[in-house]
Amino acid sequence: MKRTLLSLALGVVFCASAWAQNAPKYVFYFIGDGMGVNQVNAAETFGAAIEGTIGIKPLTFPSFPHVALVNTQSASHGITDSAAGGTALATGRKTYNNAIGVLTDSITPVTSVAVWAKEAGAAVGIATSVSVDHATPACFYAHQKHRKMYAEIGRELVASNFDFFAGSDFLKPAPLHEGEANLYDQARAKGFTIANGYKEFAKQYRKADRMILLQNKENNARDNASIPYALDRKKGDLTLADITRATIAFLQKKNPEKFFCMIEAGKIDWACHNNDAAPMVREVIDADEAVRVAYEFYRQHPEETLILITADHETGGITLGSGGYSLNLPALTSQKISSYLYTTRLKELSKRMGKKFTWDFVRRDLQEYFGFGKSIKLTAEEEKTLHDAFDNLISGKDKGFQSLYASESGLSSAAKQIVSKNAHIGWTTLGHTDGYVPVFAIGAGAEAFHGRIDNTEIPKTIARLAGYPMPEDLK
């Protein structure tokens, strides 16, 4: 027994010594919202399939040398939401679903690894592909009993002492009270420079003391909840890779010696809530492109940089295979638009075309945007499903499709379901699951992430590696 305890003690000393020798100065904490193991596998298998091979086309982050599996349950539910999951990943504490940075009593605030990094003298950035006040980023700076308290969360962002934020926009920037300034003006009063789009950022960041990078005003006028899906992107749209470049540029300017950043790929989750496979795989690939930007930084500072990417939970219960032993992932290339954006397109076409908005026209449009009748051959039943959905749409009988982040037409929903069916992809839920999520890590101290771990261990391990001060009860 004494020998066992001695061995354990020596192991702890060895690990602590190894971590001290490899303390990272630059920490990249990526979170793929909703990204379970199968989402990653789907993206890599898709890459191989479109090149005509069976297997995977390796992405950058799944090729990192250190890997772990993560439990994601919250304090209140076997299946976590993004708020409780984000709180665990940010603060090392379990809480109830919907809670942002508070304990299960709903009032006791808990600090995050980003706060600990700031206390250690690091420059700190929080970035996302969705709104800056959404659940995952909010968990790193806010303390609210419910994730939908966007106005209050936004005010906590402005009041934080962090250096850089990036995302689509604030969801509720308007004044809460008469005589109060909006959040943009409040942020400017606190020393933030606000840039709309990457070009504005590039012009402004060198002279800025603190910054908030948002997408361009044109996109925010259409949809300020997120930047566009990679599948729907147009030239000039803000990308997660842009956001990562901006994060590095600003934080390195702010403190060349030490920085911490959390960067969320938020729309993997949104695509999975919609059970929309084509944008989902491209969001994972898009997240990889952002990680690759950080990886290039790591290559310049390999002994001083830690990169890890994990997830708050799995979304959609996706399966690669829906009967039999074949996959047809190249079918996903037939879809040129997210089902969410196609709903918008149908509304605009119907309004503009009037009586010329006919089934014959829409059938040709579906061929262009989903490959139906060309790369995807429709069965008679599928053709009828689409035609019936069109009839319901123009007659006002369309019940549509509702998920957490989208309200779609029945026609758009039917189209994406046909694509998934042809790709042999299955979905079990419009919500989250309790599936394991991965951690992939590289760099200084990355070997600390291995085996099966709880989500609360991740921020604590980052803090130990980087030498950030943690609350006593977490040590």
Language-model features, listed with the residues they occupy:
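Bacterial N-terminal signal peptides
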Residues: 7-17
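Residues that line or immediately flank small-molecule/substrate-binding pockets and catalytic motifs
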Residues: 8, 131, 169
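Positively charged n-region of N-terminal signal peptides that target proteins for export
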Residues: 1-4
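Boundary at the C-terminal end of the N-terminal hydrophobic targeting segment
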Residues: 18-22
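Short alpha-helical "patches" and their helix-cap loops
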Residues: 7, 102-105, 474-475
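A post-motif C-terminal structural segment
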Residues: 25-26, 35-41, 45-87, 134-475
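Mobile, glycine-rich extracellular loop/lid and propeptide segments
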Residues: 24-42, 89-96, 101-139, 157
